[in-house]
Amino acid sequence: MARKGSSIRLSSSRISTLLLFMFATFASFYVAGRLWQESQTRVHLINELDRVTGQGKSAISVDDTLKIIACREQKKTLAALEMELSSARQEGFVSKSPKLADGTETKKRPLVVIGIMTSLGNKKKRDAVRQAWMGTGASLKKLESEKGVIARFVIGRSANKGDSMDKSIDTENSQTDDFIILDDVVEAPEEASKKVKLFFAYAADRWDAQFYAKAIDNIYVNIDALGTTLAAHLENPRAYIGCMKSGEVFSEPNHKWYEPEWWKFGDKKAYFRHAYGEMYVITHALARFVSINRDILHSYAHDDVSTGSWFVGLDVKHVDEGKFCCSAWSSEAICAGV
């Protein structure tokens, strides 16, 4: 009986050993498999990183690799957001509320800001404009509050800054308070395009208006006709409105309308369609576009050509409005030469 019991115990011990051996073997295969998978993942990530970066440097840890990949994804997201912001800027969105000179926010959105281009020696013309349609003092404020029309003379500085001509403008402005003085512009024909560009930029930054108009100081503006015409274009976010024209580009240096960059307009030397420079209007979004891109917008010899060139490659509605042809006066005309 003792021999039989001893045999049973020996058999049971062998079975336990066999089971333990099998379990250990399976565990070894499992651990080896997991280690193999992790090593393969590590190798794949390293190879992928080398492929993307073009570098065959020594392997880095998986954690560092994942951090690099996550960082790149964040950069892609940031780039996408920057593109959306750029697009929003081109649409005319602004991130701040426009304010008046005293720091208070505007309550009613102006219809249009009119910049009247004037020169240092043109006081008589300015006085004629004030008397004819612009007004001064209380009447100028009434034009803003009741009609939503802000009118300002736009002028640069003398080539000799601080001279008697500059002081004369400062004195006049202290009496009338109806100037936009652009300190970065020298009053000279060759800076006319820069003057218009900086006016649009300044006005768009200061006033949140529906429209912005460029005019000259020897025309009469029919405010009621202007308001009626602009009201018809309130739903168009990118409109360029004026008396449209095109014509010959003059390459002769002695010609009145000489264009130094005439060769850019092709063999036929013809301008693209653009508005006469006496008066034209652009919408808020286009004025914001000029403001944002003021440093890279090219200027030609003539300001009306320059303005047209800024919009020729954009999705802009060109409105050929005969009422802006100031030389053809009628009862419905918006402007007329004086």
UniProtKB/Swiss-Prot annotation:
<dbReference type="GO" id="GO:1990714">
    <property type="term" value="F:hydroxyproline O-galactosyltransferase activity"/>
</dbReference>
<dbReference type="GO" id="GO:0005797">
    <property type="term" value="C:Golgi medial cisterna"/>
</dbReference>
<keyword id="KW-0333">Golgi apparatus</keyword>
<dbReference type="InterPro" id="IPR002659">
    <property type="entry name" value="Glyco_trans_31"/>
</dbReference>
<dbReference type="GO" id="GO:0018258">
    <property type="term" value="P:protein O-linked glycosylation via hydroxyproline"/>
</dbReference>
<comment type="pathway">
    <text>Protein modification; protein glycosylation.</text>
</comment>
<comment type="function">
    <text>Possesses hydroxyproline O-galactosyltransferase activity. Transfers galactose from UDP-galactose to hydroxyproline residues in the arabinogalactan proteins (AGPs). Is specific for AGPs containing non-contiguous peptidyl hydroxyproline residues. The addition of galactose onto the peptidyl hydroxyproline residues in AGP core proteins represents the first committed step in arabinogalactan polysaccharide addition. AGP glycans play essential roles in both vegetative and reproductive plant growth.</text>
</comment>
<feature type="transmembrane region" description="Helical; Signal-anchor for type II membrane protein">
    <location>
        <begin position="13"/>
        <end position="32"/>
    </location>
</feature>
<keyword id="KW-0472">Membrane</keyword>
<keyword id="KW-0808">Transferase</keyword>
<dbReference type="GO" id="GO:0010405">
    <property type="term" value="P:arabinogalactan protein metabolic process"/>
</dbReference>
<keyword id="KW-0328">Glycosyltransferase</keyword>
<dbReference type="GO" id="GO:0000139">
    <property type="term" value="C:Golgi membrane"/>
</dbReference>
<feature type="topological domain" description="Cytoplasmic">
    <location>
        <begin position="1"/>
        <end position="12"/>
    </location>
</feature>
<keyword id="KW-1133">Transmembrane helix</keyword>
<dbReference type="InterPro" id="IPR025298">
    <property type="entry name" value="DUF4094"/>
</dbReference>
<feature type="topological domain" description="Lumenal">
    <location>
        <begin position="33"/>
        <end position="338"/>
    </location>
</feature>
<dbReference type="GO" id="GO:0005768">
    <property type="term" value="C:endosome"/>
</dbReference>
<comment type="similarity">
    <text>Belongs to the glycosyltransferase 31 family.</text>
</comment>
<dbReference type="GO" id="GO:0005794">
    <property type="term" value="C:Golgi apparatus"/>
</dbReference>
<dbReference type="GO" id="GO:0005802">
    <property type="term" value="C:trans-Golgi network"/>
</dbReference>
<keyword id="KW-0735">Signal-anchor</keyword>
<keyword id="KW-0464">Manganese</keyword>
<keyword id="KW-0812">Transmembrane</keyword>
<dbReference type="Pfam" id="PF13334">
    <property type="entry name" value="DUF4094"/>
</dbReference>
<dbReference type="Pfam" id="PF01762">
    <property type="entry name" value="Galactosyl_T"/>
</dbReference>
<protein>
    <recommendedName>
        <fullName>Hydroxyproline O-galactosyltransferase HPGT1</fullName>
        <ecNumber>2.4.1.-</ecNumber>
    </recommendedName>
</protein>
